[in-house]
């Protein structure tokens, strides 16, 4: 039985978000053994329990108050929200923040040999999908009537198998669609992973732990999106060098031993430093340019 004094977090047991969710928790300093097949794993250093479940169960667990937090794709969350509203429920939860992984898009796809002149081409057609409510909302807004074919997997084979005229499914590269004679024709929803919290009163100790976790998540994401940059640069061209690094804080400037015209620059940049940028820095006279990853970061 779950201990209600411990913070309960639901994550995907296996699948698209599983590895990234586990990595995020680990980088937040939560020591936990997630390599076993147990449904519930207890953190060693914090009062936190991790529930490993199917991704489409996570929104319901949060909305029903079974767990305190959940890491879930916005596509799954929105589908469950629409499903419950269609049944007359009023689901409650809070989205604490979007995360920096799990990006995908939900798209319409049709056979490659069929003409496409917009959603109206699907009027009266049968569409296979695992997201019937998101599909209905989109096509209702377009004034398109259709028949839904609900499939929980292998949606892309439906047209070839004669089950549907088109599909609505998650797309990453489009290779699976191409292999099944389909082409992506319209994106209806873009999604990333997000962290959600249940509605209702929360014990002060739990809320303090959630606040601490949010601060650490922010630090992890900032660290992943930032780089620590060091270089030697001509003193008279510092502003030109800084202008090439948008998003960077004002740099730390240090004198170089035996050098009057050059200084050492240290800075954190929130921008990806491409080879082209490094070549421009070098053209301005910068040298010994180092770009380093940041493990942890807190403003």
From Swiss-Prot:
<dbReference type="GO" id="GO:0005737">
    <property type="term" value="C:cytoplasm"/>
</dbReference>
<dbReference type="InterPro" id="IPR001348">
    <property type="entry name" value="ATP_PRibTrfase_HisG"/>
</dbReference>
<protein>
    <recommendedName>
        <fullName>ATP phosphoribosyltransferase</fullName>
        <ecNumber>2.4.2.17</ecNumber>
    </recommendedName>
</protein>
<keyword id="KW-0028">Amino-acid biosynthesis</keyword>
<keyword id="KW-0067">ATP-binding</keyword>
<dbReference type="InterPro" id="IPR018198">
    <property type="entry name" value="ATP_PRibTrfase_CS"/>
</dbReference>
<keyword id="KW-0368">Histidine biosynthesis</keyword>
<dbReference type="InterPro" id="IPR013820">
    <property type="entry name" value="ATP_PRibTrfase_cat"/>
</dbReference>
<comment type="subunit">
    <text>Equilibrium between an active dimeric form, an inactive hexameric form and higher aggregates. Interconversion between the various forms is largely reversible and is influenced by the natural substrates and inhibitors of the enzyme.</text>
</comment>
<dbReference type="Pfam" id="PF01634">
    <property type="entry name" value="HisG"/>
</dbReference>
<dbReference type="InterPro" id="IPR020621">
    <property type="entry name" value="ATP-PRT_HisG_long"/>
</dbReference>
<dbReference type="InterPro" id="IPR013115">
    <property type="entry name" value="HisG_C"/>
</dbReference>
<dbReference type="InterPro" id="IPR011322">
    <property type="entry name" value="N-reg_PII-like_a/b"/>
</dbReference>
<dbReference type="Pfam" id="PF08029">
    <property type="entry name" value="HisG_C"/>
</dbReference>
<comment type="function">
    <text>Catalyzes the condensation of ATP and 5-phosphoribose 1-diphosphate to form N'-(5'-phosphoribosyl)-ATP (PR-ATP). Has a crucial role in the pathway because the rate of histidine biosynthesis seems to be controlled primarily by regulation of HisG enzymatic activity.</text>
</comment>
<keyword id="KW-0460">Magnesium</keyword>
<keyword id="KW-0479">Metal-binding</keyword>
<dbReference type="GO" id="GO:0003879">
    <property type="term" value="F:ATP phosphoribosyltransferase activity"/>
</dbReference>
<dbReference type="InterPro" id="IPR015867">
    <property type="entry name" value="N-reg_PII/ATP_PRibTrfase_C"/>
</dbReference>
<dbReference type="GO" id="GO:0000105">
    <property type="term" value="P:L-histidine biosynthetic process"/>
</dbReference>
<keyword id="KW-0808">Transferase</keyword>
<keyword id="KW-0547">Nucleotide-binding</keyword>
<keyword id="KW-0963">Cytoplasm</keyword>
<dbReference type="GO" id="GO:0000287">
    <property type="term" value="F:magnesium ion binding"/>
</dbReference>
<comment type="similarity">
    <text>Belongs to the ATP phosphoribosyltransferase family. Long subfamily.</text>
</comment>
<keyword id="KW-0328">Glycosyltransferase</keyword>
<comment type="pathway">
    <text>Amino-acid biosynthesis; L-histidine biosynthesis; L-histidine from 5-phospho-alpha-D-ribose 1-diphosphate: step 1/9.</text>
</comment>
<dbReference type="GO" id="GO:0005524">
    <property type="term" value="F:ATP binding"/>
</dbReference>
